[in-house]
Amino acid sequence: MALFIRFLLLPFYFLLIVMNLWQEIKESFREGSALTRLIYINLGVFLIIRITNVFYFLAGTPFPFLDWLALPADFSTLASRPWTLLTYMFLHFDFLHILFNLLWLFWMGQIFLAYFDQRKLVAIYVLGGICGGLFYIAGYNSFPVFNEIVTDSRLLGASASVIAIVTALAVHAPNHTLQLMFIGPVKMKYIALFSVVMYVIGISSSNAGGNLAHLGGAFWGVIYILQLRRGVDLGKWINNFFSGLKRLFRPSPKVKLSYRKPVDDIEYNRVKNQEKTRINEILDKISKSGYDSLSKEEKEILFRMGKE
């Protein structure tokens, strides 16, 4: 009898485990970095697509969602699905495709965040993906070799976004060295250069569209950093756009008096990272030249941060 009762309770135990897991995922997403959220979004879309595909397969009906989320090369199809220029970069269908893309994103994203704030990571991911999509569309509608397949071609995956991060790092920190398995230490500039050469060669392969998109992402990564050096953040508008969407769908808070301007999580983390970097610079200066070498402003910053 006790065994029978346990058997009946199994679905409830399973449901409890799922609910606890879902709660942990939500908390991790809410409290995680921009890199964590990008990875979660890609994984979430992948799982939803693959699970939904199972039901369509069992019903014996075509699976329509890839066509509605992947980026078409044909202009007329794109005009009816403009959102695909954004959705395609979060869309994967093959397990190995998403595995390698997310491993590459996790690895390069961590290095990127060592040099830049989270808002710039979001900007370069999204705009690198858009630039890659535009290269793909332009290539398929410009070169005669694609004339017969342009109407049926679709692009999906985060590869263009990831390679944008790689080339951005190669321009900003060309001598940053990575330890590659079976190879040893390799500088970032050589990793980016090798990748770009392989993408150019790969245009004549079966994945011509993907390689065109990779080149577009690589191009954006270079342009973004070069403009950033001139004091121009080409990705600022995309973060403002997402912040506006977040405020639009966020429930209205209760009205209360506040003398400080509220900031979102990304902005808060950006400010904290800047403060931390500034303090480290001041401490390094003290260790090298002593406390008396600090300027009046640096002493005030150190005093203020010590009180917090």
Regions found by a protein language model. Give the residues of each.
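Terminal membrane-proximal soluble interaction domains of membrane-associated proteins
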Residues: N273-E308
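A detector for small-residue-rich transmembrane helices and their helix-helix packing motifs
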Residues: A2-Q274, R278, I282
